[in-house]
Structures are given as structure tokens and as C-alpha cells.
């Protein structure tokens, strides 16, 4: 059943805090950083944080560099992914729409993530195009013998990757509507249980981590590796030794 929320009972206190580490403050701060890095231009992309049984999600259609705490949606967790009308919003900005990324974020949280980031990084898009050209559909982005690989986990409780390891990131096909990516994202998660990221062809990437710091630093490390891979390709250098 759809849950009607009025201004009177909108639980605004859930997004009001002087603590800079509160999710309602962290999400706008992260979105501004990501905008300045070119990851979330034109209102694209999104960020979500889970704290206990609450999920804080950036809205749809708000310029990322202008986002404020009062723009943030709050969901109970766990909550159904589908249909959208069954999602348990306990705080909704009345003039905004929930992020179309919501069911994909929920898929990450169901795996135990504490934060999920979606970017439209140009480097992420470019590597999906290069993999498509070189390997065809179903290919993975793979790279080895690069120091920054050490910033990526091997898997839950398995420590971090090493210099000589080969990083493999699955790539899924894009869809006309963001929410329709959910099934293929979940399939990629199931087939690659140690991955913390999934690339979306001609679109961007989803990255998640145990907490905000881990999700952010993993996203930074991956973007560095994607940019490096594009430059290596220009020079005719292989990604995997």
C-alpha cells in the first residue's frame, strides 16, 4: 500500500543534524565533491547511505552541487524493491521524486553495504566501450600490476588486492530506464560475489562499500584505474601482464 506523507508528519528531524558525519549532511557534501570531479553532471548519478534501519538517498533531478539535507529521502530498511509504491519511505521531500537508482542501491544494501555510489564518470564509460570493442558482449574490465589496485578489496573479509592480482569488474548492458538495470545488476553480484563494483555499458558505474569512507575511496581508486587504462590503450600498452 502506498504510504501518504504530509508536511505535518514528514519526519524532518531525520535529516536535521549538526553532525557533519550524519548521512543527510554527508550525501550533499559527497555529491558536491563528485560534481567537481565530473562524476555527476546534469543531475546524473546518485549516492545512498545506510545507517542502522534507515536508508538515506539523494533525490532525482536536483543539481548535485546544490543539494541540501532537506532534499534527502529516508527509507526504512529492509524495504521492498518492487513495486515502488511498497517502499517504506518515512521521510519524503514533497516537491521531489525519489532517485531512479533506489532499487539498485537497495540491492547493494541487501549485500551488507553501508554506502553505494553511482557515477557517470567518463572514464568508466570509456572503458566499457573499449571492452565492448575488444571482447564483445559479456566482457569484463581487467587490469593488473598497477599499484592502485591495492585500494580495492578482494572480497568480504578477504583483505585488499595486491599489486600482482588481476582486478575484474563485470559489465552489464544499459537499459532505457535506470530501475530496469536492477535484475542484471543483481545477477552480476551473484555471479561475482567478491566484487564491489559493476560497470554499466555506455552509462557509468555502481560502487559500494562497508561504509562511506570505503565506498568513496574504492570509487576513487577505480576511476584512477579507468583513466589510466584509457591512457594505456592510447599507447598500445596491455591492461593485464
Swiss-Prot record:
A Gene Ontology term for the protein's cellular component: cytoplasm
Subcellular location per the Swiss-Prot or TrEMBL entry: Cytoplasm
Enzyme class: lyase
Binding site for substrate: 101
Molecular function GO labels: methylthioribulose 1-phosphate dehydratase activity; zinc ion binding
Catalytic activity: 5-(methylsulfanyl)-D-ribulose 1-phosphate = 5-methylsulfanyl-2,3-dioxopentyl phosphate + H2O
Biased composition (Basic and acidic residues): 1-12
EC number per UniProt: 4.2.1.109
Disordered, as annotated region: 1-22
List of catalytic residues: 147
Residues annotated as binding Zn(2+): 118, 120, 203
Pathway(s) this gene product operates in, as recorded in its UniProt entry: Amino-acid biosynthesis; L-methionine biosynthesis via salvage pathway; L-methionine from S-methyl-5-thio-alpha-D-ribose 1-phosphate: step 2/6
Cofactors that this protein relies on: Zn(2+)
Cofactor note: Binds 1 zinc ion per subunit.
Pfam name, any one: Aldolase_II
Major place of residence: cytoplasm
Keywords linked to the UniProt accession: Amino-acid biosynthesis, Cytoplasm, Lyase, Metal-binding, Methionine biosynthesis, Zinc
A single BP term in Gene Ontology: L-methionine salvage from methylthioadenosine
Function, as annotated: Catalyzes the dehydration of methylthioribulose-1-phosphate (MTRu-1-P) into 2,3-diketo-5-methylthiopentyl-1-phosphate (DK-MTP-1-P).
UniProt similarity note: Belongs to the aldolase class II family. MtnB subfamily.
Protein name: Methylthioribulose-1-phosphate dehydratase
Source organism: Aspergillus terreus (strain NIH 2624 / FGSC A1156)
